[in-house]
């Protein structure tokens, strides 16, 4: 008998060795000591896991950097209307970051924890993003019509309440589905019956999609709510409505594709192994749609001032008023229509900006002969004509029309010598009264 048992064991060992080797065999690119649950993250024969892992990792880094930029730009936001939306936009970025992280749960092989996180977080994270878009469109509708919208905490509360509805729905659905899938068993030694909980991976694809009806309604509401912002009176808010419209339209296309593939396409082609890649691709594609079509444009617009603030900056300049400012103001006055009847008598130099120091010729005032009234009163009536002291306009108009406003002593002497040579009405010749020969008082 012992000989027969030994012979059977020797014949049966080759039959069990291939199965044992197959269980311990690791795919190319993975370590033999690695848990088989994570083979898709390093399997080079099926590259979809590695590609999605790289795409999701890049998305996590990008979203994290954009979140830091958005929070750091808070002190530089001049428009109070845009500042009130920063809390909702940061909440949106956290939801997008969660979508990129959930891609890894869809890449690894299913077990109880990964399937539970997929079923619960898939709808909750999308509800966060779509609720923030709805709250943003609600604010944009007020801004596009009245140029003032709700306060920031009101917008954030709307997004938070819409998200909590999906949290409640998913929690109840997951509990009811898992308990309903189990059977009723009796506990030994106890008269009551207990309910066994089935695995969340056993949930049908159609049931999973039906649980996302509320999320689809949020997506549709965000898409329809973005259209009225394009018809508002204040046009500067239209571009924000365009950002939301592009994001929701692309998301609708992605959701239609992955739902058709998840519920119909994979069954028709008899490839249920593509269920997990379908969910992972949908998550990564929709998350990058949020980043490219909504987050990056909004971050680039958040620090731009409003037109009202730009107008106030032009009305009240902060720089000082100097000589350059005066010249600019004089140049700006040329845009008005002038009366040409008076502009003909003005010299051409008056049309150019004149420096305040252009009238100074470098001579001191002591060289100018200007007798005071007291000196004339003490001196008495002069022998000469009054036009010697107060010269009239003569042929020498070049002296009077010069840029200097005072007469020089040499010019006065030339006028007096000209009048001395002219006989007076009494037939006498006026004496040469040069300013140099007069006694000073």
Curated annotation (Swiss-Prot):
Residues 71-84, 141-154, 229-240, 300-441 are cytoplasmic. Keywords: Cell membrane, G-protein coupled receptor, Glycoprotein, Membrane, Phosphoprotein, Receptor, Signal, Transducer, Transmembrane, Transmembrane helix. The modification Phosphothreonine is found at residue 422. The chain crosses the membrane at residues 50-70, 85-105, 120-140, 155-175, 208-228, 241-261, 279-299. It is found in: Cell membrane. The lineage of its organism: Eukaryota, Metazoa, Chordata, Craniata, Vertebrata. It is a multi-pass membrane protein. This is G-protein coupled receptor family C group 5 member C. GO terms for cellular component: extracellular exosome; intracellular membrane-bounded organelle; plasma membrane; receptor complex. Residues 419-441 are annotated as: Disordered. This retinoic acid-inducible G-protein coupled receptor provide evidence for a possible interaction between retinoid and G-protein signaling pathways. InterPro entries: GPCR_3_C (IPR017978), RA-inducible_GPCR3 (IPR051753). The keyword Calcium does not apply. The keyword Transmembrane helix applies. Glycans are attached at residue 190. Residues 23-49, 106-119, 176-207, 262-278 are extracellular. Residues 1-22 form the signal peptide. Coiled coil: none annotated. The modification Phosphoserine is found at residues 343, 382, 402, 405, 434. GO terms for molecular function: G protein-coupled receptor activity; protein kinase activator activity. The gene is Gprc5c. The modification Phosphotyrosine is found at residue 413. Its main location: membrane. Residues 430-441 have a biased composition (Polar residues).
């Amino acid at each position: 008998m012992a000989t027969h048992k030994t012979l059977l064991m020797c014949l049966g060992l080759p039959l069990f060795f291939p199965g044992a080797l197959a269980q311990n065999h690791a795919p190319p690119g993975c370590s033999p000591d690695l848990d088989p649950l994570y083979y898709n993250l390093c399997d080079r024969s099926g590259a979809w896991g590695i590609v999605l892992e790289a795409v999701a990792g890049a998305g996590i880094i990008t979203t994290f950097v954009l979140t830091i930029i958005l929070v750091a730009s808070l002190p530089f936001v001049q428009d109070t209307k845009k500042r009130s939306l920063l809390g909702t936009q940061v909440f949106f970025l956290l939801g997008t970051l969660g979508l990129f992280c959930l891609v890894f749960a869809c890449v690894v092989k299913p077990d109880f924890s990964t399937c539970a996180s997929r079923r619960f977080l898939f709808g909750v994270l999308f509800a966060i993003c779509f609720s923030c878009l709805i709250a943003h469109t609600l604010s944009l509708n007020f801004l596009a019509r009245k140029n003032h919208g709700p306060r920031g905490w009101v917008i954030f509360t709307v997004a938070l309440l819409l998200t909590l509805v999906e949290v409640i729905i998913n929690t109840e659905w997951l509990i009811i589905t898992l308990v309903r899938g189990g059977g009723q068993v009796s506990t030994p030694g106890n008269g009551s019956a207990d309910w066994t909980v089935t695995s969340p991976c056993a949930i049908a694809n159609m049931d999973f999609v039906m649980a996302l009806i509320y999320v689809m309604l949020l997506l549709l509401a965000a898409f329809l709510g973005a259209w009225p912002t394009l018809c508002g009176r204040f046009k500067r808010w239209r571009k924000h409505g365009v950002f939301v419209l592009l994001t929701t339209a692309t998301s609708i296309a992605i959701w239609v594709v992955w739902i058709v593939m998840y519920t119909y396409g994979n069954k028709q082609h008899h490839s249920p192994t593509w269920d997990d890649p379908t969910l992972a691709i949908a998550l990564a594609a929709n998350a990058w749609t949020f980043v490219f079509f909504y987050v990056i444009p909004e971050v680039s617009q958040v620090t731009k001032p409003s037109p009202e603030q730009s107008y106030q900056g032009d009305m009240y300049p902060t720089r000082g008023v100097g000589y350059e400012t005066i010249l600019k103001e004089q140049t700006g006055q040329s845009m008005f229509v002038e009366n040409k009847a008076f502009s003909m008598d003005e010299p051409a130099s008056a049309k150019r900006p004149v420096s305040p120091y252009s009238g100074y010729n470098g001579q001191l005032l002591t060289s100018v002969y200007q007798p005071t009234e007291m000196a004339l009163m003490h001196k008495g009536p002069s022998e000469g004509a009054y036009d010697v002291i107060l010269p009239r306009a003569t042929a020498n108009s070049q002296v009077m029309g010069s840029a200097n406003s005072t007469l020089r002593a040499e010019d006065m002497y030339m006028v007096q010598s000209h009048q001395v040579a002219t006989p007076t009405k009494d037939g006498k010749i006026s004496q040469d009264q040069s300013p140099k020969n007069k006694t000073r008082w």
